[in-house]
Structures are given as structure tokens and as C-alpha cells.
From Swiss-Prot:
The modification Glycine amide is found at residue 30. Pfam families: Adipokin_hormo. This hormone, released from cells in the corpora cardiaca, causes release of diglycerides from the fat body and stimulation of muscles to use these diglycerides as an energy source during energy-demanding processes. It comes from Agrotis ipsilon (Black cutworm moth). The keyword Secreted applies. InterPro entries: Adipokinetic_hormone_CS, AKH/RPCH_hormone. It is found in: Secreted. PROSITE patterns: AKH. This is Adipokinetic prohormone type 1. Belongs to the AKH/HRTH/RPCH family. GO terms for molecular function: hormone activity. GO terms for cellular component: extracellular region. Residues 34-68 form a propeptide. Expressed in antennal lobe (AL), corpora cardiaca (CC), corpora allata (CA) and gnathal ganglion (GNG) (at protein level). Expression in CC and CA detected in all animals, expression in GNG in some animals and in AL in few animals (at protein level).
């Protein structure tokens, strides 16, 4: 009885995976990636520079913390 329930569980999992593969299509377009790419050109250089400076400051802080 235990083997039958394990077999049924495995078959059910495989059916779910097969259904997910069958419902996927490449004709959906860019999806979320297309929306991100469209808004990336709207970023200002000042914002990018501020983010770069923030990352640089955090990296320097991490290096200072690692010194013995």
C-alpha cells in the first residue's frame, strides 16, 4: 500500500511538471524583461552616479571592517 501511494505521488508531480512545460510558449514576448528594458533609458546619469558612489562607500566600509 505504501509503494502505491508513493508511486501515485511521483506520477502526480510529473504531471504537474509536464503541464507547466506544455503551457509555456515563447510567443509571450518580453514580459517583465521588456518592461524593464523600456524604462532603463529613463534613468538619469545623476542617479546612476549616486548609486555607484553608494556602492563604492559600502565597499570601503567592508574593507575597513575586514582589517585586523
Amino acid at each position: 500500500m505504501n509503494y502505491v501511494s508513493i508511486f501515485v505521488l511521483i506520477v502526480a508531480c510529473l504531471c504537474v511538471l509536464a503541464d507547466a512545460q506544455l503551457t509555456f510558449t515563447s510567443s509571450w514576448g518580453g514580459g517583465k524583461r521588456g518592461a524593464v528594458a523600456a524604462t532603463m533609458s529613463c534613468r538619469s546619469e545623476e542617479t546612476i552616479a549616486a548609486i555607484y558612489k553608494l556602492i563604492q562607500n559600502e565597499a570601503e566600509r567592508l574593507l575597513l571592517c575586514q582589517k585586523p
